[in-house]
Amino acid sequence: YSSATYTMDSLAQGYRGISTYNSVLNGNLKEFVDVCYPELYYMDQNRYAFWPNAEDNFLAAFTGVRYLLSKSGDLDSSKYELMQQFGGIYLYRNVQEAATARFYVNTISEDSLKELCNEENRETLLENSLALEDGREIEDLSDLEEISDAQKKSSVVLNAPEKDSCITGTVSARADGYVLCMIPYENGWTVSVDGEEVETEKGDLGFLAFPVKEGEHQLTITFHAPGLKAGVGASIVCWIIYFGMLGYGRRRKRKAAVS
C-alpha cells in the first residue's frame, strides 16, 4: 500500500483512491488528527498519510476503508482478510464494518473529546459518541452512555456519487440522532433531508454532521464552492468593462483618423 502512495495507482486504474491528496490542509480535519490520531502526521505537521498506519483497521473502518492493496501476503488476518492475489499484489478486506457515514444517538462535547482522547481510549470514544460543539460534557469514560439498540440498528447508506459535487443516500433512524459523514467539514456543503435543508455541524472536530429525526429519510448532500457566484459575477463585470474600454479606444482612434 505504500507504493501506491507514490505512484498514484488510483489515477492510472480509474478508481477514487485516498492514498494521495494534494491541497491546502483542511483546518478542521487537521484538528481531528491533532487530537485523535497524531501519528498520521508524515515527516512534519503539514502533511499526514494513512499508509504508515494502515494496519490500524479501526481507523480504516472509521474512515470508510473497506479494502487494502498490499505487496505483503501475510498481514494480520485478525484485521484484514485475504481475498485475492493479482501477481505480486494482494487484495485484503477489512474485517471491521467500514462505512462512509454512520448514525449516532449519543453525543459528547468537543472539549470532552479533546480532554479524554488518547491512544488507549480513542476507539471507545469515537465508536460510542459523536463529538459536537454543544454535546454532553463528560469528565471520564465511565460517564459515557451505553450504545443503545436504536444506535446499533440505525443505518446510513451513501450512494456512489455520479458527480463530485452531489451525494445522495438514505437513513434508517430508529431514534432522533445525528449522521456523521466522512467528508471534511468546510463551508460550501449543504444537506437536505427529504427535500428540506437542515443545519450542518462539525462532528468529531473535522467531519460533516447533521441532525435527523426518527424514521426513513432520503439524503442529498451538495457542495457549492464558497464565493463562486460572486466571483463569476465580478468576472463578468470586469469583462464588460474591459470590452467597453476596448470599444471606446477604437472609437477614439477612428475619430482621430477621420479628423
Where are these regions (language model features)?
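Conserved luminal/periplasmic juxtamembrane motif of membrane-embedded glycan-processing enzymes
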Residues: 1-151, 166, 180, 258
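Active-site-proximal, structured, solvent-exposed surfaces of multi-pass membrane proteins
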Residues: 129-259
